[in-house]
From Swiss-Prot:
Its cofactor is Mg(2+). HAMAP family: RuBisCO_L_type1. Binds 1 Mg(2+) ion per subunit. It comes from the Eukaryota. Keywords: Calvin cycle, Carbon dioxide fixation, Chloroplast, Lyase, Magnesium, Metal-binding, Monooxygenase, Oxidoreductase, Photorespiration, Photosynthesis, Plastid, S-nitrosylation. It is found in: Plastid, Chloroplast. RuBisCO catalyzes two reactions: the carboxylation of D-ribulose 1,5-bisphosphate, the primary event in carbon dioxide fixation, as well as the oxidative fragmentation of the pentose substrate in the photorespiration process. Both reactions occur simultaneously and in competition at the same active site. Carbon dioxide and oxygen bind in the same pocket of the enzyme in a similar manner. The basic functional RuBisCO is composed of a large chain homodimer in a 'head-to-tail' conformation. In form I RuBisCO this homodimer is arranged in a barrel-like tetramer with the small subunits forming a tetrameric 'cap' on each end of the 'barrel'. The record marks 342 as: Transition state stabilizer. This is Ribulose bisphosphate carboxylase large chain. Pfam families: RuBisCO_large, RuBisCO_large_N.
Amino acid sequence: MSQSLEEKSVQERTRIKNSRYESGVIPYAKMGYWNPDYQVKDTDVLALFRVTPQPGVDPIEAAAAVAGESSTATWTVVWTDLLTAADLYRAKAYKVDQVPNNPEQYFAYIAYELDLFEEGSIANLTASIIGNVFGFKAVKALRLEDMRLPFAYIKTFQGPATGVILERERLDKFGRPLLGCTTKPKLGLSGKNYGRVVYEALKGGLDFVKDDENINSQPFMRWRERYLFVMEAVNKAAAATGEVKGHYLNVTAATMEEMYARAQLAKELGSVIIMIDLVIGYTAIQTMAKWARDNDMILHLHRAGNSTYSRQKNHGMNFRVICKWMRMAGVDHIHAGTVVGKLEGDPIITRGFYKTLLLPKLERNLQEGLFFDMDWASLRKVMPVASGGIHAGQMHQLIHYLGEDVVLQFGGGTIGHPDGIQSGATANRVALEAMILARNENRDFLTEGPEILREAAKNCGALRTALDLWKDITFNYTSTDTSDFVETPTANI
């Protein structure tokens, strides 16, 4: 007997249902999270992960699992997938390459539909990209190496509150790096002695002095006391030198209300710049960036806490991603490495950080760790800050590696000068101006740097003392985050 039309219809619906839905646990790669034929769209958010699969886990399945767990998947198939445009909203791992000279690690390229992310929210972006997926058992270790944020998405962020160009115009300082100093010791000084340090450093020739990351409002010096003494010092130094001076007043606090109060007093006292720490969190950073833009203040970000997740090469997140997120969030300054100082910083990788903060467009450069072309959609530039173990004798190296759009912060290299803080500041200023003059005369200042400094020191006792004290001290430790990015064919295994 032939089947009725109704029976055929039921069978067809059953067939379609079975083809679309399978209960239980299915490999992520078979659920649509792996698609080597996927054509990347200009509007896709792209992420590059360094994946170390657990022993026995196929790298393609590991990449698909990362895509799934950072987008729409859970550990089992759910029938409510049929109520959404699942094929659209699934992240797609579309390329997997073995890391050169490391058979246990793989670069996994993953594309995300733009509609998966709330506009203008770093918190929402990070909840997906670095959320639960980093604790997923299928991967032994996972590191977010780079991202491409599409033009349309970047346009939903305000970007830096002030930017490099406007900052230079406000300070009336052009054609050279800015000079700074972190007050030392970072903890324990009274407000009055703290202000004395600030005055001496600024009067000696520095442009900025700063609070360190953990100076907030402790029993030995409450924040109002510090602000009052510091701004008195800033104003006196500005009057004595005829230059615009500043001090990064750290407004980091336990609550947003308290941060607002501290920032407001800084503004009322005439400060041109305030400071926050990375550890306050992405939402607080964006919130203070909005306040800074609304109140015409420069916003300095200290990357306190960054190395807890960025320093290890196989797990965590590369600092270049933080650079991108912070440019979107709206900070004006961020510590980005010195190359020659005491903190982590491979020269080639650090160059990639500086490009990320300063260029209007990024071009793919695997050696520098830049995996994607990316247009910054006219967002303002962020001023990189170099600090940690640098001194006047390295001035030629600093300018060679870092260029002129940078704040060079000499903490111990100013306050540790045997003749006092003002002499330390003067030594740094004279060294900088001598090197900039040599650069402008088209001299090979990197090679001739030591000679240029010795010549300048003949007319500056403070610089001569600094060179005699620190000589050619450099922290030559091997970086843990070196370049291993070379072009390799896709291994769709």
